[in-house]
Amino acid sequence: MAEAARRQGGGRPLPPPPRGVNQQPPRPKPEPVDREKTCPLLLRVFTKSGGHHTSEDYAVRGKEPKDEVQIYTWKDASLRELTDLVKEVSVAARRRNARLSFAFVYPNNKGGYNVREVGETMAYPNRKQPDDSKTLSELPFEIGDYLDVAIY
């Protein structure tokens, strides 16, 4: 009797899939950009020591935070590459133990802005960090988004 119930689906439920198994197929790696033939994009970068700017800091167009750096780059730029560019212009980012947290700032459908953290790097890593190789194109970056960099 119990055997018949199992055959008809009345037995014990199946165990869940093992942890750590990715249920979604991996996204294809974006094609590298030919930097000789492709025009760079203007990335507006806002830096702040101690934390990220708030979404209210970006609320009024034309009155964005003052600590802006404009960088011409490509969508295949990695967070490590952007870290090195920020270090060129920010004294705080050059500290030996400085940690840089990256966030995208993008408009929402309510007329304001969202701030979403996307990765973290070290100014002078003693080993490769997990987010170092993430590129703008692998992250949900769209041309026109701002990059907010918190320096700790």
UniProtKB/Swiss-Prot annotation:
Name of one Pfam family that matches: SAP18
Any single GO BP term: response to abscisic acid
Taxonomic superkingdom: Eukaryota
Disruption-associated phenotype: Plants are hypersensitive to salt.
Residue runs in coiled coils: none
Comp. bias intervals (Basic and acidic residues): 28-38
Tissue expression remark: Ubiquitous, with low level in flowers.
UniProt keyword list: Repressor, Stress response, Transcription, Transcription regulation
GO molecular function, one term: transcription corepressor activity
One GO CC annotation: nucleolus
Induction profile: By salt, cold, drought, abscisic acid and ethylene treatment.
Region listing for Disordered, in residue ranges: 1-38
Assembly description: Interacts with SIN3, ERF3, ERF4 and HDA19.
Family per similarity comment: Belongs to the SAP18 family.
Function, in words: Links the histone deacetylase complex to transcriptional repressors bound to chromatin. Involved in the tethering of the SIN3 complex to core histone proteins.
Protein name in UniProt: Histone deacetylase complex subunit SAP18
Organism: Arabidopsis thaliana (Mouse-ear cress)
Organism placement in taxonomy: Eukaryota, Viridiplantae, Streptophyta, Embryophyta, Tracheophyta
